[in-house]
Structures are given as C-alpha cells and as structure tokens.
Amino acid sequence: VRNAYQGIGTEYETLLRAFDKENAAFAKRVGKDRAKTTYNKYLTVRKYVAEFIKYKYKRSDMSMNELTEEFIRDYCLYLKNVVGLAQSSIWIYSIPLKHIVTTAHYNGKIPRNPFAMYHVDPDHKEREFLTLDELTAMTEINLEDPNMAFARDLFLFGCWTGISFIDIKNLTEDNICIVNGAPWIVSKRQKTGVPFQIKLMDIPIQIIERYKSFRKDCHLFHIGDHGTINKHIKRVAAMCGIKKQVSFHVSRHSWAVLALEYGMPIESVSKILGHTNITTTQIYAKVTSNKLDHDISVFESRIKGHLPVIGGMV
C-alpha cells in the first residue's frame, strides 16, 4: 500500500531504476563515443543519490513523480554538508541527475521537470593557463627521459590545437584532411559528439611526424593512461620553473587564451573547441589584461578625433 501511495509500484518509474537503465546503456558506449571517466561519474552520482534518499527519506528508492525543486536543493546541500564536496564538484555531480530527470520528463514519465525551476551554480573559477613564455620554456627544455618528452610533446600538441586529452588519444590518420594544401584535424569530441576542426600549425605537424615510427595501429599517438601523462607534465613544468598547477587540460585553456589574445574571434575559438555555444567559451577562455589593453587601445585610436571637446571652466 505504501509503495502504491508513493508511486513505487512496478508500473512506475523510480529514480534509481532510471539511473540503472541509463548506466547500463552508457556502459555499452564506453570506448566508442563515451569516456570511461564519464561513466564512472554516473556510477558515483547514482551512489550519492541512493545514499541521499536513504539519509533524507529513510527509503531505498523513490518515484520520479515525487521529485521537486526541494529534492534537488536538499540533494545539493547533502553533497555539501554531508559528503563535503566543493560547489564546483556539486555542480558536476548534479549534471547526471539533471540528465536522468530531464530525459524522463521529455519521455512523458513525469509531468514536470524540477530542474526547469532550479539552477545549480557551477561556481566558475579562474582557469589556469600558460603564457607564451612558459610554453616556450616547456618547448625548448631538453628531456633525457623519453616518457617525459612524449608527455611534454602531447601537452604541446594540445596547446597548439586546443584538443582535449581523450580526443587526441582517439585521433587516427583518417582525421587528417588536406584543405587548400594544408593539413587539418577534423573529428568529433568524445565527450559531446560535437564536430570540431582545426588547421595544423608547424609545432603539431612536427610532433605528428616525430612519433610516426612509434605507431602500433592507425592512431596518431600510442598514449597510455591520463594519470601517468599528467604526472610527467607536472614534473616538466616544475623543471621549467613554472609554479602553476599544470595538468593536461591546461593545454586546452592555454590554446583558447592565446587564440583570443592574438585576435581570433571568439566565434572561431568556440567552433574549434567544439563548444555548442559561446557562453561556454567565455567561461573556458580567460581574456588577459594584454588582450583587454590591446582592445581598448584599438577602440581609442578609432574613436580619437570623433570625440567632442570638453568646455572650459566657467
């Protein structure tokens, strides 16, 4: 009787049941068009949601029909106060839940979407990036350890293409296309499936050629696990005197910042990064003071001569 009242009968969709179905379907796509890390995130969120339901409602599951804005707010507070997550992590762990709930709404399983009226703040922080001088230092340093050199070269490839680690790992010879006599990378982001393309400059071309003889299949690079590559990159950065928290993803940030700083329109930056909207790019790419100074100087030079003269003192 209680289950029927709460909508947990076999004919009703429950939240954890919906998670299990989504995760089972997701697992089949891992290694194809979905990343193992994202799958693990969905599993973690499923665990947190189950623990929250037990903590808050003293139950093992709940009907999708019971979900409200209050449920989402309390779940986020649970992640903050009980689990101890930072706001940025809470935002990340709310995304799979939002996907499950929104999909259920679109499929007619629930009459309303509680996420439509509740927004989880991502708490955007300043994105770390390397300056051109820092990139030059990492480029010019001589490395005797071939593993460290390879990690550095992959990092530089990301710095001059804006391509993420997993998408670099997925690149094959088929992703290189010749357009107007120049080589381009044309592919899709594994994370979102959004197409991206970028013309290859000299440094990424040199890196591709450098590791051609090391290929074991059609992939451009034979890359190990993310953690090992990151460890080598941090060591190289430290050897170059770089005090920043450097990880592989900093290469993508660095490309975006340099592209904007040297005048590439944000629409083009967004397209190359594979973003679905410019709002994401504005968060992702930090506009430096040098870029702002340049833009203001250009504005000043263009408007000079058109300004009215301030009248003298009365």
What are these model-predicted stretches?
Residues 6, 10-46:
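Short, aromatic/basic-rich helix-turn unit that serves as a nucleic-acid recognition element
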Residues 37, 44-55, 81-115, 166:
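N-terminal DNA-binding recognition helix of tyrosine site-specific recombinases/integrases
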Residues 87, 91-93, 110, 114-165:
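Basic, Lys/Arg- and aromatic-enriched nucleic-acid-binding interface segment
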Residues 119, 125-128, 134, 170-207:
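Conserved tyrosine-mediated DNA breakage-rejoining catalytic core shared by Y-recombinases
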Residues 124, 190-209, 215-235:
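C-terminal catalytic core of Y-nucleophile DNA break-rejoin enzymes
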Residues 129, 189-193, 226, 273, ...:
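Catalytic-site neighborhood detector that most strongly recognizes the C-terminal catalytic loop/helix
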Residues 156, 160, 166-167, 235, ...:
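C-terminal catalytic core of tyrosine-transesterase DNA break-rejoin enzymes
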Residues 299-314:
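C-terminal secondary-structure termini that scaffold catalytic or DNA-interacting sites
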